Amino acid sequence: MSLLTEVETYVLSIVPSGPLKAEIAQRLEDVFAGKNTDLEALMEWLKTRPILSPLTKGILGFVFTLTVPSERGLQRRRFVQNALNGNGDPNNMDRAVKLYKKLKREITFHGAKEVALSYSTGALASCMGLIYNRMGTVTTEVALGLVCATCEQIADSQHRSHRQMVTTTNPLIRHENRMVLTSTTAKAMEQMAGSSEQAAEAMEVASQARQMVQAMRTIGTHPSSSAGLKDDLLENLQAYQKRMGVQMQRFK
């Protein structure tokens, strides 16, 4: 796996699924391929994106700044600086300085990532802030190692929290989660459908599923009533794809 592919993988792992994630993936691909060279416009676009947490925006801004060639004196962006200040905690800053000194001795991406993984997310963000604010310089490869270590830690905690939700025994949370997944699957089907005759059929199925979820939420239904909802919808999607001659693995 190439270095930039690895960076893209780690960075996208902390972006919530949805149309915005697809858009960010496209931007990253363009930047890494050298197709997008307007850092100013890119940062303005990033700043106004909804849904993303300030830290995720800060990390993306840091990656764009590292990889898009720009004039030396280009202004640093406040939204990135604020996100990478380790919540203003002096302990984070102290640890960030120690980490920075260690990173100065590293020359490889993986070496930097290994060193960084033993620090807290706050210290890692502060260290990125040091580099972003030009208070310290490391090679691009080492800086990207730091980015990936930070993303790995964030993705780990997101995964733990997601697993807790998926394995929860609380029937109300499970019920709501199934309805949310059904609704987002239906939305994805509508976006994929296009305009052929079969597409109208897929749209109809998706629309019915969303109406059903709406009705269930309005009336208030028994927590077990949502069991299998998403799977039924995915089976319909699978059948639709087969008729369209598209053979894809299940989304489950």
Curated annotation (Swiss-Prot):
Pfam families: Flu_M1 (PF00598), Flu_M1_C (PF08289). InterPro entries: Flu_matrix_M1, Flu_matrix_M1_C, Flu_matrix_M1_N, Flu_matrix_M1_N_sub1, Flu_matrix_M1_N_sub2, INFV_M1. Residues 165-252 are annotated as: RNP-binding. A motif (Nuclear localization signal) lies at residues 101-105. Coiled coil: none annotated. It is a peripheral membrane protein. GO terms for molecular function: RNA binding; structural constituent of virion. Residues 1-164 are annotated as: Membrane-binding. GO terms for biological process: viral budding from plasma membrane. Gene3D superfamilies: 1.10.10.180, 1.20.91.10. SMART domains: Flu_M1_C. It comes from the Viruses. Keywords: Host nucleus, Membrane, RNA-binding, Viral matrix protein, Virion. One of its GO terms (cellular component) is membrane. It is found in: Virion membrane; Host nucleus. Plays critical roles in virus replication, from virus entry and uncoating to assembly and budding of the virus particle. M1 binding to ribonucleocapsids (RNPs) in nucleus seems to inhibit viral transcription. Interaction of viral NEP with M1-RNP is thought to promote nuclear export of the complex, which is targeted to the virion assembly site at the apical plasma membrane in polarized epithelial cells. Interactions with NA and HA may bring M1, a non-raft-associated protein, into lipid rafts. Forms a continuous shell on the inner side of the lipid bilayer in virion, where it binds the RNP. Determines the virion's shape: spherical or filamentous. Clinical isolates of influenza are characterized by the presence of significant proportion of filamentous virions, whereas after multiple passage on eggs or cell culture, virions have only spherical morphology. Filamentous virions are thought to be important to infect neighboring cells, and spherical virions more suited to spread through aerosol between hosts organisms. Most abundant protein in virion. When expressed alone can form virus-like particles in transfected cells. Homodimer and homomultimer. Interacts with NEP. Binds ribonucleocapsid by both interacting with genomic RNA and NP protein. May interact with HA and NA. Cannot bind NP without genomic RNA. Belongs to the influenza viruses Matrix protein M1 family. This is Matrix protein 1.
